[in-house]
Amino acid sequence: MRLFGLILAGGEGRRMGGTDKASLTLGGRLLVTWVAERLGPQVEELAISANGDPARFAGLGLPVLRDEHPQGPLSGVLAGLRWAAAAGADALVTAPVDTPFVPGDLAPRLWLAGEGTCAVAEAGGRVHPACGLWPVAVAEDLAAWLAAGEARVMGFAARHGAARAGFPDENAFLNLNAPEDLARAESLLRKDA
């Protein structure tokens, strides 16, 4: 099993006042660094899905994949699947750039839950479909899904009967969508220190 990883960083950050979330800091470190350090050890190769100037990620030494047709997170997943397939990977594990506490066992738990098919994370009774596992075999179906105007991550996951991998810590998937979410994450860091 060859798992590749992808940090989804192509969003517009509207609820953060239009700020590029990858450039936000938490505990003095970039959000993209938090996710890279947590997801990177779980996968064979790691890349970033982002639009705009890729030079802003140069310090990470990771490939930056652009969306062919920006239509939300699934466009990034498609770019990642094509990259992973070209390199001989079996599946792609994704995590958004604004989930800095993503679990250190995300990839293996998704793989075990899905048994080689699609799988998404679940914690605290909530599904987190952007934290998912996507076999490279679904790439062309995803391209057709996007071409038909569909863009919902959970809709595509359901189309492929995605399994759910349960995680005990709901804070592991704390999504930093707004300034108050970032403040909450800072508070959690102080508690853990």
UniProtKB/Swiss-Prot annotation:
CDD domains: MobA
Location(s) in or outside the cell: Cytoplasm
Pfam families assigned: NTP_transf_3
Highest taxon above the source species: Bacteria
EC number: 2.7.7.77
InterPro entries, per database record: MobA-like_NTP_Trfase, Molybde_CF_guanTrfase, Nucleotide-diphossugar_trans
Keywords associated with the record: Cytoplasm, GTP-binding, Magnesium, Metal-binding, Molybdenum cofactor biosynthesis, Nucleotide-binding, Transferase
Record's comment describing the protein's domains: The N-terminal domain determines nucleotide recognition and specific binding, while the C-terminal domain determines the specific binding to the target protein.
Protein's recorded name: Molybdenum cofactor guanylyltransferase
